[in-house]
Amino acid sequence: MSSVPQIKVPATYMRGGTSKGVFFKLDDLPEAAQVAGKARDQLLLRVIGSPDPYGKQIDGMGGATSSTSKTVILEKSAQSEHDVDYLFGQVSIDQPFVDWSGNCGNLTAAVGSFAISNGLVDAERIPENGICTVRIWQKNIQKTIIAHVPVTNGQVQETGDFELDGVTFPAAEVQIEFLDPADDGEEGGDMFPTGNVVDQLEVPEIGTFQATFINAGIPTIFLNAEDIGYQGTELQDHINGDNAALARFEKIRAYGAVQMGLIKDISEAAARQHTPKIAFVSQPKAYTSSSGKTVEAADVDLLVRALSMGKLHHAMMGTAAVAIGTAAAIPGTLVNLAAGGGEREAVRFGHPSGTLRVGAQAELIDGKWAVKKAIMSRSARVLMEGWVRVPGDTF
């Protein structure tokens, strides 16, 4: 049997928010992978260790969860008034595809840090000490994101005392602004794709549910927890070990995707695992988080649990947090009603790992709701930098 030597590609392994991923500069990729297509997808699949029928990603950099099966490609921005172009790829764990349909809000927190450290931000824009404002063009969703990255002695500051539920160790705070987060592109249409803040979602053999469909941060389907038999206090083990429940969620997600106009037939949902997300909400209740910490009902405005890539997320996807903050700011959505109704510019919600505060500024313009921006804080840190190796016949 002939052997094929491995090739090595410069890469950085980073945590951003409650996710981890492999970061690349576009011009560091092999030439065939510098353009979208089969070669790029095959490279990223092999880097992460997919597809893996065992579901472990042992032979790659992935961690066998939706939060750790991620890749990022960055380059100097081709857009005016922007520093860096950011492309995100969600790698399927057990299937041979990379989903490019949405953003990763958590890894967004690491984009600014990487861009500063890797020469993608003009040196004159980086303060010796203070906050560097990194202007990000998110290529998947065609939106602007602003990252406020702390800098000390001309270098990105990664350590600090900011605590983020779902991350064990404190780090430096990175504030993220998602400008005009509602999806007005070809696939999404208006913020509310049906024109309603609440719809009826009929799912054959499962039931009919109230649902809020929203395109903000990431396309998301919100349901009431009690309508689907939950309290809103559930942790991962309550749902991820129940294959029948996961199948029900996926069927609901598929029918919701059709109603949102994201796909034409439910059969297409299997190849679009990253979007839309599906989440369920409830009024505040006390619960014990996955770390053992008690979250009191008085600590939060509502509870939210969300699924990503077919599993209940261990904390909350950053883009889904944008959707939560946006929906909470708009009277009448299921998220807003779970939080007590009325107008608000910020909400603190409980998730499996603890709590998170997210703000959004909404206004009614010509009969349609618009959101100027959504804001939240995350943190980021370089875990490893060097080269990642893949067999030379990968692509």
Regions found by a protein language model. Give the residues of each.
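A glycine-rich beta-to-alpha transition motif near the start of alpha/beta enzyme domains, typified by
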Residues: 1-395
